Amino acid sequence: HPRRRLDDAERVIGEHPGLNTYQIAGMMQWKIRAKDWDDFPPGQKYFAMSETLAHLEHLLLEGRIQKEQAGDEAPVYLIK
């Protein structure tokens, strides 16, 4: 499961470079009964974003992605 999530986050970043954590989480595959990210209950979005952020940090430590931040903007992620 953790490896699948890491691969899924990396896939999203590869297909859509320059997204922030919220946007990446919204494009990942989740097993929840919601038709799309907008339909996720707020609590589930919070947990999904927390999990996504942990996976992004792991991918950063592995050197598979990079993080960029401009000023006060939310950081965005790119494939290395």
Language model regions located:
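Long, low-complexity, charged/polar intrinsically disordered regions in eukaryotic proteins
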Residues: 1-14
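C-terminal regulatory/interaction regions
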Residues: 11-80
